[in-house]
């Protein structure tokens, strides 16, 4: 951080606004928004960061800021600045091309075309189709059924398409404008999903052709009917109300975000758009930036409704999109948003799985890690993590990676037995003693490397038990996290030292996966244990609430907190009699009355080791 930046940091206001980071050439490399400019901009130059943020900060030599009246103004300004300057570190959509649409032109003799430009020219537009191949497939089918004009300028004689029955040859055609408008309406109905009439017409024509012994023409009609059927199967029915809507869902993990947009037209999912990119700020804020870019830079018609996840600022989206914005609580629309979120998670998991499944990279990472630590190649790595909240239900977990891949059959869970209160060192001592005491007693194969989730204190505890008490010779390393609970540095050696390990390396990525998996496994076990203990104790003694109903409540609401927040009606919906539901509310809310009959549904999407903001 240079002196110029230090001086400017002291002048930052606490107002909302936008900040602009520049490199040594004065080029804008990142634009961001903040509710509090002072806190946000200073955060870049304090503490440690993940790899991608460190890369950004290393290039910043100057910054500017613009104060706005509100957060929404800051959001709109940020989108405009990104659009104008195209900073390399900002969220950018896949390309600057617009999505293709199928268009019926507003001409005396209309044409059916593919276009990426939506204009107010009286034409009928259908789409968007992120997959241009799908748009072309539909157009080819329509060309075979409806003989629209193909030529931009009237030819002097009939064209090739006239001879194959795909053009009316309007220069010699005797049909009036009403005929073509009627045909345009049929296409419109077809693209809106009302294709039964067209199929009936084709079936009638096929029957007439067969009776007239025109078998080739009958076969052509048959093929068209089959093609429409195939197209139907590709367009899944998602909603019964036949509305046009865009459905947004997103998922974040390991500094990456995936946003999926489902295009639902006339109740059918016709296409989806998928984007994966690194994010630098709060995921909710970066998602809003994405939505703004999506509707400003992707030239397509805004639908009747836009569905967004629960945690997103509805008013901010309304400022970006001139449409009805909904955050569905339940039912069909809620399922659509959940489906978009699920697909975003799957896409992001696939991205990381592809990296994990790269055998050469993983094997190379293991070998390089061994060379870096000056130990034999650590084929088997065992890693430990503790979990407790204020000392309650303390647990520990061990995960095992063999050849760089999780060996889940070897995972182990430990309830802490000898420690009272939140003592991480004592818990680590107990678990290490139990695990490797058993390895020694039963002559089990020891690991090639032990990785402890923690710093110098935890690693030294493990060394005392393994080397001094048990007399085992097993290398032990520590993975220390930063204040954001992200893998930060590797500790190893005697005495312990920070290992010079690039955060962009496959070795670091492997260790990060191991640490994340140990944390996920430990916290999952802890939550299960804590939930079981709390759930059983607080719901015991309620007449009419047996084990089966308790299980159903837990399965539906996921946690005791959610049951406590639920209304009586919502509890009844799970199959609990009203009198019992009222008793549950009285037991869980002893200082007040049962919650209102209609309450807002809340869903917690936070999962172990990941940030999943719907």
Curated annotation (Swiss-Prot):
DNA repair recorded as keyword: yes
Domain of life: Bacteria
Record GO terms (molecular function): DNA binding; excinuclease ABC activity
Annotated region (Disordered), positions in chain: 595-614
Residues in GIY-YIG domain copies: 14-91
Main localisation: cytoplasm
Record SMART domains: GIYc
A single Gene Ontology CC term: excinuclease repair complex
One BP term from GO: SOS response
Task performed by this protein: The UvrABC repair system catalyzes the recognition and processing of DNA lesions. UvrC both incises the 5' and 3' sides of the lesion. The N-terminal half is responsible for the 3' incision and the C-terminal half is responsible for the 5' incision.
Similarity remark: Belongs to the UvrC family.
Name the record gives this protein: UvrABC system protein C
Annotated organism of origin: Streptococcus pneumoniae (strain 70585)
